[in-house]
Amino acid sequence: MPRAVAGPEIERLIQLIARLPGLGPRSARRVALHLIKKREALMAPLAAAMTDALGKIVECRRCGNVDVCDPCTICTDTSRDRRTLVVVADVGDLWALERAGVLNAPYHVLGGVLSPLDGVGPEDLNLAKLVTRVHEDEVGEVILALGATVDGQTTAHYITDLLREAHVRVTRLAQGVPVGGELDYLDEGTLSAAIRARTQM
């Protein structure tokens, strides 16, 4: 068993950082060491920002986005095209599309994708509220901005069937999204091309 290299507070910091996606123990040690070296310039402001965010961040009951207000900033933006609704798997995908700046519509966050192997079924996703929004808001087009993974495509087909009786145009992202790709990892140019070339489901 490896020995601790620092006091329990530092070891706890390293262990917590290692829980972040994409960071293992070695990367977590490097991040922790950088934070410790930059205590005043980085660690203290980061701790304050995290404490502030913890007390203020809420999930939007309307769309599933995270913000400091409910409904969120996007849902209350009256300049957005309410006849279009963009469906994404998670908030990271919403942020990626907002960075690309090619859509001016509200979003609907599913909270994941259908994945029978992982035990994620329709009841685990924010699908009932999607159908309600499409009807109540008189949506004309639903853009399925889901990853080109098997689970993403399965979810897209499920939603298409779910909305068939709503007589709404259902489109999905086309070129630019590689098979097996996740939206959060794509650059803005690729996302822009995919939005412009979306296809009818």
From Swiss-Prot:
Record family assignment: Belongs to the RecR family.
- Identify a single GO molecular function assigned to this protein: zinc ion binding
In terms of NCBIfam families, this protein maps to: recR
**Could you tell me what this protein is called?**
Recombination protein RecR
- Please name the HAMAP family in this protein's record: RecR
UniProt KW keywords: DNA damage, DNA recombination, DNA repair, Metal-binding, Zinc, Zinc-finger
Instruction: State the InterPro entries in the record.
Output: DNA_Rcmb_RecR, Rcmb_RecR, Rcmb_RecR_Znf, TOPRIM_dom, TOPRIM_RecR
Protein purpose: May play a role in DNA repair. It seems to be involved in an RecBC-independent recombinational process of DNA repair. It may act with RecF and RecO.
Q: Which stretches does the record call C4-type zinc fingers?
A: 60-75
Q: Do you know which Pfam families this protein is assigned to?
A: RecR_C, RecR_HhH, Toprim_4
Which organism is the protein's source? Xanthobacter autotrophicus (strain ATCC BAA-1158 / Py2)
Span of domain Toprim? 83-178
Q: Would you say which domain of life the source belongs to?
A: Bacteria
* GO biological process entries: DNA recombination; DNA repair
Its gene is recR
